[in-house]
Design a protein with these regions (language model features):
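Conserved Nudix-box catalytic region and its N-terminal flanking loop in Nudix hydrolases
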Residues: 28-68
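Acidic, metal-coordinating catalytic segment for phosphate/diphosphate chemistry
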Residues: 1-23
Length: 156
């Protein structure tokens, strides 16, 4: 079994963990958004992952972006704080995690783009190309909030 994201699914298993996480929306100078195709569920996704003991959430998003993309980034603003109890992630080991993620808009400051052991592919997409991609609804929501350029982060 692979990782399964449940979103507004009445048949989803009940969450048994809650772990802070961060994701990065990395846009290039053309306004294209960086996504990687995950090896655990084949979805296109934003770079990101869980917080480790001893780091703050800013360090989490920088580390995860580096690990998953090869790029060095600088967080610029918070796009949103996502904690919907109707979004749970089911893992093969029996863990069912309630989402709790802070999404950051990030600027590239260095590094070289590459895939990681967590992805099949990585590339920039123009916003109008995103609808055709195999992507979880929660990723679409984060990108939509980013493209709205709101002064206030989404909280929900």
């Amino acid at each position: 079994m692979q990782r399964i994201d449940h979103f507004n699914d009445p048949n989803a298993p009940r969450a048994n963990t809650l772990i802070p996480a961060a994701s990065a929306i990395i846009a290039n100078e053309h306004g294209e958004i960086l996504l990687h195709q995950r090896s655990d569920n084949n979805f296109w996704a934003l770079p990101g992952g869980t917080m480790e003991i001893g780091e703050n959430i800013r360090q989490t998003v920088i580390r995860e972006a580096r690990e998953e993309t090869g790029l060095e980034v600088q967080p610029q603003r918070i796009v949103g704080i996502y904690s919907d109890p109707k979004h749970v992630i089911e893992y093969p080991d029996g863990e069912v995690r309630q989402e709790f993620s802070i999404c950051f808009a990030c600027r590239i400051v260095g590094g070289k783009l590459r895939t990681s052991d967590e992805s099949f592919a990585i590339r920039f997409f123009s916003p109008h190309d995103l609808e055709r991609l195999n992507m979880h609804e929660s990723t679409h929501i984060r990108i939509q909030h980013f493209l709205e350029h709101s002064q206030n982060p989404f909280i929900g």
